[in-house]
Each structure stands twice: as C-alpha cells, then as structure tokens.
Amino acid sequence: MRMMLRVSIPVEAGNAAVKAGTLGSTIERILADLKPEAAYFFADDDGNRSGSIVFDLKDSSQVPAIAEPWFLAFNAKVSLRPVMNPQDLATAGPSIGKAAQQHGK
C-alpha cells in the first residue's frame, strides 16, 4: 500500500546533527533502507526540518522498523497515512461512485 510518511525533526536535534556532520548521512541511510518512491524535504510551519516520504508498505508489521530510525536518530515526530496517485484514484473511481449511490443524499 502506498503510504506517506511525514517526519518532523525538532530544531535542537536537527542542529545537533548538522553540527556533528551526520544529518545528511543519517537521512540517506534511513532512506536507503526504506527505498521510497519519492522524498521531499522542507521547513514545516513550526520551523522544524521536515520531510514527506512516499513508499510502499507491504505489511503493517513494518511500521516500527520505518518509524523507529527517525525516533532514535532525531527524536522526530512521525505520522503515516495511506495516499493515492492519479492512477490509484482512477482505479478507485467506480467504488467512489457506488458509495455515492448507496450512501449519498
């Protein structure tokens, strides 16, 4: 299942990693294990170093292995949610129409 991982690294932890010269290499190592479809990094609305990472979750038992590296390396906040690309949404179209017929007013 295609998932979006949102990661928010607190300023203090991010600064410590930058000063130690490990921020980039640690993120690269985590991403190498995750093998994401896409990864984007930015400053979030609270000024934290953050990322949105899209990857394939094969089984829910993978969640700890995906989240723990961020927790342990950066004391990061992590959230996960299923997402769709345009092709997924097109495939879902008939079920959306069926739900509208059955439950719409």
Q: For each predicted feature, which ranges?
A:
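Conserved, structured core segments of small domains
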Residues: 1-105
